[in-house]
Design a protein with these regions (language model features):
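Residues at or immediately flanking beta-strands
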Residues: 34, 68, 155-157, 190-194, ...
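N-terminal pre-domain/capping segments
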Residues: 1-101, 192, 299-311
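Hydrophobic residues within beta-strands of alpha/beta enzymes
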Residues: 35-37, 107, 156, 225, ...
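Active-site beta-loop-alpha junctions enriched in small/polar residues
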Residues: 7-11, 38-42, 74-76, 112-114, ...
Length: 311
């Protein structure tokens, strides 16, 4: 069964659950079946440790709503981290425990990076040689297998990565074939792939591979979808202001489908025909005022792509 969902931006919550009831009620009223929430927006993990009182506070709110729940791990989580590696492992474990306690079936995780975003502007662009890259990926795979193996009730969904100038490729996950290989290396039935349409659009344009072929490569291990739009123009890591980026069409804009130039029929059309997971319309907070209009467009898009084709 396909479940349509949207996200509550972590910056909107910023550690407070006060807005959750109203946001959840609004999402349910729009006819959506799910919601995705950044765990980091709930202020439930501090220096790797899970605050179970925050979990209970969340559950008390969540129990009032009949929505499918997915969580997004902190963007800063890096299972290849060379600095504070043990803390990153604690964060990953705490995220999975939060999911298990709250009843969330899916945790979206950004795969390990050669250069983490937290080091942009400090570290130089760097990509390991093939041997070092393989060893790092094997270590990450063992880490995920060990920690995720303790939470078989939670699906870990590794997300294909966005691109940044001048650091890309800053992670193997910019390349669909390498992300697929990593999931197969992990070899757990509850570890799969989150296809992010915006990230794929950026990576395909920057690296020169076929967008639809990249999506098709990931399809066999696909467990989760992030659907949003952009113009496929990679920006510099320092370009953070959406008000300035949108006029130039640069970066990971997380716009409603139809505002950019992604060919959704070619990229996700074939996937949606048989997909039975959660498809999240993952938008930036700046689109919240017109959320109803944007979700209607998202619902029409998905319905049209899943409609039977003429014989």
């Amino acid at each position: 069964m396909l479940t349509l969902s949207t996200n509550i931006h972590d910056g909107r919550l910023d550690g407070s659950m006060a807005k959750l009831p109203g946001d959840l009620a609004r999402i349910a009223a729009l006819g959506l079946g799910g919601v995705e929430i950044g765990i980091h927006g709930l202020d439930a993990i501090r220096c790797g440790r899970l605050d179970r009182s925050r979990v209970e506070a969340f559950k008390a709110i969540w129990s009032e709503y009949d929505l499918a729940l997915s969580f997004h791990a902190p963007d800063t989580l890096d299972l290849m981290a060379r600095r504070d590696h043990d803390v990153h492992l604690q964060v990953f474990s705490s995220c999975l425990e939060f999911c298990s306690l709250a009843g969330a079936k899916t945790l979206v995780v950004h795969p390990g990076r050669w250069v983490p975003e937290t080091d942009f502007g400090i570290a130089s662009p760097w990509t390991p040689d093939p041997t070092a890259a393989r060893e790092a990926m094997e270590t990450e795979a063992r880490t995920i297998r060990s920690i995720a193996g303790q939470f078989p009730d939670v699906v870990v969904s590794l997300e294909n990565a966005r691109t940044f100038l001048p650091y890309s490729p800053h992670t193997y996950a910019e390349f669909p074939e390498l992300l697929l290989a990593q999931v197969e290396r992990i070899d757990l039935p509850h570890v799969g792939i989150c296809l992010d349409t915006g990230h794929l659009h950026l990576a395909s344009r920057l690296h020169g591979f076929s967008e639809s072929h990249g999506a098709a490569l990931l399809a066999p291990r696909l467990v989760h979808l992030h659907i949003h739009d952009n113009f496929g123009r990679t920006g510099y890591w320092s370009e953070k202001n959406q008000t300035g980026q949108v006029p130039l069409g640069r970066g990971d804009l997380h716009m409603p489908p139809g505002l950019g130039d992604i060919d959704f029929a070619a990229v996700v059309g074939p996937i949606l025909e048989n997909f039975s997971g959660i498809a999240v319309c993952e938008l930036r907070g700046r689109y919240l005022d017109a959320l109803g209009e944007h979700i209607e467009g998202f619902q029409r898009l998905v319905s049209g792509l899943r409609a039977p084709r003429p014989a």
